[in-house]
Design a protein with these regions (language model features):
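Glycoside hydrolase catalytic-domain context in secreted enzymes
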Residues: 1-334
Length: 334
């Protein structure tokens, strides 16, 4: 046995990220002890017997927790002046003009938004699922979307396929092709692929998805599933690779990298902490930030940093008491 001791705490080496951003806690409010001090004892190697997990029952949310859980944060200004909002302006911009512009303070983003007609904006916000509707005023094309981690299952091959074989499109499908009625939700699930421990096989899966995207005009694919198997009773476990963060990361990176070679955006989900199917819309998930960063978030982190994933599907649950799709620490800072 070799023992290694640190003479004194190093507060410098890991104080900033590679780009100089200060490393700070972002999920402190995900710890139940943040809301109810000294309620939960977390397992530690230094005291296995004294800190081994137990079931916590009969806990009552505090008034502060209830206020946040209610999520009643939208304030309606009865005296607002809608004339200050511009629709349908002629500013001569297209969405493509802002390709690569990541600075949201760039005034061109505001000018571009001013060009959108009210009706087009409402359609874009109100209709989703299998398609992000086109906005002609800014030349934003329709983007076909589909689920999920175990194969493309939201629509058949022919629903959005190009059936004009005279168009010059090498992926056009004859309108009489019997495969147009095929729904590609037939792949084995991610758990089975992960059990092979083969990144090569995961990459082959990605290639199949990418190739199919060309024939079906698929632009955005909601997969891979990068959550962990935190409990055997999670009905979404079949969409996630494993209980191990590193195995999940390796599989997801191979899959996404290979699939995106075909031009399809592959967006991992459900970000983050989706560990149940029943009541998953709104259930409050609590854990320490260490647990989140070292385990739960690793698969998505690798998908972005190592595979270059260009999209993410957020989860329906809460991060502590806050909704996952509105938690600033999770979505903006981490």
């Amino acid at each position: 046995t070799k023992t290694w001791n640190v003479a004194e705490l190093d507060k410098i080496s890991f104080a900033t990220t590679k780009n100089g951003t200060a490393v700070e806690n972002q999920l402190a409010d995900m710890d139940l002890n943040y809301w109810m001090p000294d309620t939960v004892t977390y397992l530690t190697r230094s005291d296995w017997a004294g800190t081994f997990p137990k079931t916590y029952e009969n806990l009552t949310a505090t008034n502060e927790m209830v206020d946040v859980l209610d999520n009643d944060t939208y304030e309606i200004n009865a005296n607002g002046d809608p004339s200050t909002v511009t629709f349908g302006a002629d500013n001569g911009l297209t969405l493509a003009d802002l390709k690569g512009v990541t600075d949201l303070s760039d005034e061109r983003w505001g000018l571009l938004m001013d060009q959108i007609d009210l009706e087009d904006g409402m359609i874009r916000l109100g209709f989703g699922g299998t398609s992000t509707k086109a906005i002609e005023s800014i030349m934003s094309p329709e983007a076909i979307q589909n689920d999920g981690p175990n194969g493309i299952n939201s629509y058949t091959l022919g629903q959005y396929a190009n059936t004009d074989t005279s168009s010059g499109d090498p992926c056009a499908v004859d309108e009489n092709d019997p495969n147009l009625t095929y729904k590609f939700g037939t792949m084995c699930n991610e758990t089975v692929i992960a059990q092979t421990f083969s990144k090569e096989l995961a990459a082959e899966y990605g290639k199949v998805i990418g190739n199919y995207s060309l024939w079906s005009n698929l632009a955005i694919f909601w997969g891979a599933g990068t959550n962990l198997h935190r409990t055997p009773y999670n009905a979404r476990n079949h969409e996630y690779y494993s209980e191990d963060a590193m195995l999940t990361s390796g599989q997801a990176v191979a899959y996404i990298t290979a699939g995106q070679e075909y031009g399809c955006i592959i967006a991992p989900k459900h970000f983050a902490f989706n560990d149940t199917e029943i009541n998953r819309t709104g259930v409050a998930v609590f854990m320490t930030e260490q647990q989140a960063r070292e385990n739960e978030l690793r698969g998505t982190q690798a998908s972005i940093e190592d595979a270059g994933a260009l999209g993410i599907m957020t989860a329906f649950n809460r991060v502590g008491c806050y909704t996952a799709n509105a938690h600033t620490g999770l979505l903006m800072n981490i």
